[in-house]
Amino acid sequence: MMSAASTNPEFPIATSGTKDIVLAFSGGLDTSFCIPYLQERGYAVHTVFADTGGVDAEEREFIEKRAAELGAASHVTVDGGPAIWEGFVKPFVWAGEGYQGQYPLLVSDRYLIVDAALKRAEELGTRIIAHGCTGMGNDQVRFDLAVKALGDYQIVAPIREIQKEHTQTRAYEQKYLEARGFGVRAKQQAYTINENLLGLTMSGGEIDRWEAPGEGARGWCAPRSAWPSEALTVTLKFVEGEAVELDGKPLPGAKILAKLNTLFAQYGVGRGVYTGDTVIGLKGRIVFEAPGLISLLTAHRALEDAVLTKQQNRFKPDVARKWVELVYEGFYHDPLKSDIEAFLKSSQAKVNGEVTLETRGGRVDAVAVRSPHLLNTKGATYAQSADWGVEEAEGFIKLFGMSSTLYAQVNR
């Protein structure tokens, strides 16, 4: 354990009296460790749990009781569902791109957690914020950059601090808590788990060892043996690129996504093993599950394909990839992100209509699209009939390929 006399400016020690500190708390191993660790260094720890849609009522109650059990001076739970829909899901779906073409940015609720923590700090009159991020991952970058962008705060990162002296930090945290009479849930011992409205990620254990994930590394998505035998079909309605109805029923966006999570998780949709480049240059490997978000992206992309022009569909992914990179790398409050979102919002003006999704397990397909803005021609059907003549088609082909034809003629 680190000495209370540490002078590391990143981890200030309250040596006289008690200072209020706000801890972004999830009830997991890392943030559970943070409470007694900070208390023993002279802090009154006020915990904030931002409920961004990954827990049920029973789990919320557990988190509240866990904070009290560990000795938190106060605890508040903040409803982050509407904020995560407006602040992340809408622009992410408009962008339609995963990080490095795969990962759907499932821990982007970190920025909303920061907002909740800073609001609580303002209520308490303190400028000291703590989080349970490690010194090797991306979350520390997202938390710290978001806090720095929003004001002059002191950031305390206990897990990052103990990693200077302990290589097996999770084992150390567990022993630390058990030595003080606090139990640790079994799954917390093996994996780092993040859950929210967007989906679920797991790391640790065999995942970090580049081995096949065991059955314990499974959260929402049912295994193949448990998939229903009947196909699932749902219809989503979009207005200006935003999902507003599910199967004909108007619902708030966050509730639509929550229902899609439940429906498509039964069929194992949206589960993957992802290896990518982290912000700090390491390779990161996780299991992720995002049944609702993947289904929503599939429907939205099908509608865009049908109503946007060829040039829009060609150009938008380039801009979208930059937006995804900014969010992934911690630049959530950079003005370029807002600039890109203005373009993405503009591109959605005609993205209106209904899309029917279908799954029989493992993947989801958009099987029907209806929109008043479909870019089809009454007199033309792809590869079958058209309202232009053969001569017009031949002339178009000649002009369209003129540059390549001339090059070939000159260089034969």
From Swiss-Prot:
Coarse class of the protein's main subcellular location: cytoplasm
Family indicated by similarity: Belongs to the argininosuccinate synthase family. Type 1 subfamily.
Compartments it resides in: Cytoplasm
Cross-referenced Gene3D superfamilies: Argininosuccinate synthetase, chain A, domain 2, HUPs
Keyword field contains Transmembrane: no
S-S pairs: none
Uppermost EC category: ligase
NCBIfam families: argG, PRK04527.1
Enzyme Commission no: 6.3.4.5
Binding site for L-aspartate: T134, N138, D139
Name of the protein described by the UniProt record: Argininosuccinate synthase
Pathway the protein contributes to: Amino-acid biosynthesis; L-arginine biosynthesis; L-arginine from L-ornithine and carbamoyl phosphate: step 2/3
Source organism superkingdom: Bacteria
Subunit annotation: Homotetramer.
GO BP: any one term: argininosuccinate metabolic process
Keyword tags: Amino-acid biosynthesis, Arginine biosynthesis, ATP-binding, Cytoplasm, Ligase, Nucleotide-binding
Catalytic activity: L-citrulline + L-aspartate + ATP = 2-(N(omega)-L-arginino)succinate + AMP + diphosphate + H(+)
Annotated binding of ATP, by residue: A24, F25, S26, G27, G28, L29, D30, T31, S32, A50, G132
Signal peptide: none
InterPro entries: Arginosuc_syn_C, Arginosuc_syn_N, Arginosuc_synth, Arginosuc_synth_CS, Arginosuc_synth_type_1_subfam, AS_cat/multimer_dom_body, Rossmann-like_a/b/a_fold
CC per GO annotation: cytoplasm
Binding site for L-citrulline: Y103, S108, N138, R142
Gene that encodes the chain: argG
Pfam families reported in the protein's UniProt record: Arginosuc_syn_C, Arginosuc_synth
GO molecular function: argininosuccinate synthase activity; ATP binding
